[in-house]
Swiss-Prot record:
It comes from Arabidopsis thaliana. This is Aldehyde dehydrogenase family 2 member C4. Its EC number is 1.2.1.3. GO terms for molecular function: aldehyde dehydrogenase (NAD+) activity; coniferyl-aldehyde dehydrogenase [NAD(P)+] activity. It is an enzyme of class 1 (oxidoreductase).
Length: 501
């Protein structure tokens, strides 16, 4: 290991790139324009595949296929039980191809192969199984009408054609969190994966065909946000768009939806999540969770605990332990089983993170460890910790989306809560303490969609997550996610001579 980087030795065979075309109406086809774009291996900056570049014309074709499949096809007309069987078959095929999918996400996005193999891809299959289990349990309710002459009930119906726009940081899990509930609800869809990480989405399209998902239910248009993504957001025949990504892009999608057909919009956006470490926390565990919360997935995670607040009684000890442990946080080839952090997703993100690190230095924060790129090939960055960060600094305010931690001190519980809420975001937060009354007070006071107590990244298939404030307007995972793809219809009729009400 040199400068905190593993040697990258691996015996894993790299994946064969089999699918690079658009997937529309059950077929892999070239883009109408014939255009393609290159996808880059972030380990070395080299081209690994040339992928079809879809734009508005291709989105039109995909939406037409999805519309026909919804209006005339079998998918929304199947019983939930029948849909569930096909979705479970899809999950079976995902599990049979775990290694291949994990390899694709590793070479495409720099994700650790072991993480993909044992976490991301199994969780992807899990989301499809969870929603398959929900597909035959979608129902309305009988209403207790206030007017005795009326009988009413509600129906839950699929919303229609959905545009799902997927981010690059978790290309498999985010694919599943949107596609699985949409399928279970009976929707058809057009999916645009991030241009940086399109390979696994195309492989999932292939598996959906093998599973027997009817043509037109799942369509994949690879391409860029400014063209393909914008066409989905503004399309007059798309009934709903779901997006995970930056707050700035989410705002543009909402504007496009409003300017077109007022389609429903679900947004899961940026974060600048706080981790509050109180005086009674276990110092060793606190340091481990702080590093995990900030550096997991190379910091490219919307709920990263990038702002760490430590109560003054244990601040010095926590800082010492953080610096000590950060130096053992190995960075290297994602196929190296000893690596804990791979390369950033692409050159643009790599340069953005390094720019923020320079801002931190120039604005007066104290660099405790890291702060540099590693090597002269690929997009590797040292885990970086700043102390003496103040609320007016860019590294405090902005979502960096990289392995950069801002470390601050606080005195009282009230001050800690105020610091935690001092952000435009509200996606997640962590609390480390043994005091149940304090935990209850702080967890109720922080304005965030999910709070982790004495743990971090406590995700579960049944547990919804999403944002307050500028972190979004929806919840994903759990039964709440299914509601994103359903709409409620009320049916009312006269009722005469009822024996009781």
């Amino acid at each position: 290991m040199e400068n905190g980087k593993c040697n990258g030795a691996t015996t894993v065979k790299l994946p064969e790139i089999k699918f690079t075309k658009l997937f529309i109406n059950g077929q892999f086809i070239d883009a109408a324009s014939g255009k393609t774009f290159e996808t880059i291996d972030p380990r070395n900056g080299e081209v690994i595949a040339t992928i079809a570049e879809g734009d508005k014309e291709d989105v039109d074709l995909a939406v037409n296929a999805a519309r026909y499949a919804f209006d005339h096809g079998p998918w929304p007309r199947m019983t939930g039980f029948e849909r569930a069987k096909l979705i479970n078959k899809f999950a079976d095929l995902i599990e049979e191809n775990i290694e291949e999918l994990a390899k694709l996400d590793a070479v495409d996005g720099g994700k650790l192969f072991q993480l993909g193999k044992y976490a991301d891809i199994p969780a992807t299959a899990g989301h499809f199984r969870y929603n398959a289990g929900a597909a035959d349990k979608i129902h309305g309710e009988t209403l207790k009408m206030t007017r005795q002459s009326l009988f009413g009930y509600t129906l839950k119906e699929p919303i229609g054609v959905v545009g799902n726009i997927i981010p690059w940081n978790f290309p498999s899990i985010m694919f599943a969190t949107k596609v699985a509930p949409a399928m279970a609800a009976g929707c058809t869809m057009v999916v645009k994966p991030a241009e940086q990480t399109s390979l696994s989405a195309l492989f999932y399209a292939h598996l959906s065909k093998e599973a027997g998902i009817p043509d037109g239910v799942l369509n994949i248009v690879t391409g860029f946000g400014s063209t393909a993504g914008a066409a989905i957001a503004s399309h007059m025949d798309v009934d709903k768009v779901s997006f995970t990504g930056s707050t700035d892009v989410g705002r543009k999608i909402m504007q496009a939806a409003a300017a077109s057909n007022l389609k429903k919009v679900s947004l899961e956006l940026g974060g600048k999540s706080p981790l509050l470490i109180f005086n009674d926390a276990d110092i060793d565990k606190a340091a481990d969770l702080a590093l995990l919360g900030c550096f997991y997935n190379k910091g490219e995670i919307c709920v990263a605990s990038s702002r760490v607040f430590v109560q003054e009684g244990i601040y010095d000890k926590v800082v010492e332990k953080l610096v000590e442990k950060a130096k053992d946080w190995t960075v290297g080839d994602p196929f190296d089983s000893t690596a804990r952090q791979g390369p950033q997703v692409d050159k643009r993100q790599f340069e953005k993170i390094l720019s923020y690190i320079e801002h931190g230095k120039n604005e007066g924060a104290t660099l405790l460890t890291g702060g540099k790129a590693i090597g002269d090939k690929g997009y590797f960055i040292q885990p970086t910790i700043f102390a003496d960060v103040t609320e007016d600094m860019k590294i405090y305010q902005d979502e960096i989306f990289g392995p950069v931690m801002s470390l601050m001190k606080f005195k009282t519980v009230e001050e800690g809560i105020k610091c935690a809420n001092n952000t435009k975001y509200g996606l997640a937060a962590g609390i480390l303490s043994q005091d149940i009354d304090l935990i209850n007070t702080v967890s109720r006071s922080i304005k965030a969609g999910i709070i982790w107590v004495n743990c971090y990244f406590g995700f579960d298939l049944d547990c919804p997550y999403g944002g307050y404030k500028m972190s979004g307007n929806c919840r994903e995972s759990g039964m709440d996610a299914l509601d994103n793809y359903l709409q409620t219809k009320s049916v009312v009729m006269p009722l005469h001579n009822s024996p009781w009400m």
